[in-house]
Amino acid sequence: MKNSSLLFILIVVFVISSSENGIMIGEAKKCSNSWICEGDEKCKEKCMADYKGNGTCYYPSPPSKQHPEFFYPTCWCGFDC
C-alpha cells in the first residue's frame, strides 16, 4: 500500500513537470465564414475587424451548370472560435 502511494505520487509529479506550464491546454478550434469578396484588402480588413482572423479572396473557375453560385469571388475568413 505504501509503495503504491509513493509510485502514484511520483507519476503525478512526472506528468506535471513534463508539461510546459503544468497545465495541459488544447488547441483552439478553427472556424470560418465567407461572403462575396469586394477585393483582397477589404476582405482582410473585414475579417480582422469582425473575427480577428485572416481573410483571403478566392476566385473560382467559371460557373458550372451544377453550381452557378460559385462564380462570384468569395472572401474566406479563417479564425479561432
Curated annotation (Swiss-Prot):
It comes from Arabidopsis thaliana. Pfam families: AtDEF-like. The keyword Secreted applies. Belongs to the DEFL family. Disulfide bonds join 31-81, 37-57, 43-75, 47-77. InterPro entries: DEFL. Keywords: Antimicrobial, Disulfide bond, Fungicide, Plant defense, Secreted, Signal. It comes from the Eukaryota. The keyword DNA repair does not apply. This is Putative defensin-like protein 188. It is found in: Secreted. Residues 1-19 form the signal peptide. One of its GO terms (cellular component) is extracellular region. One of its GO terms (biological process) is killing of cells of another organism. Transmembrane segments: none annotated.
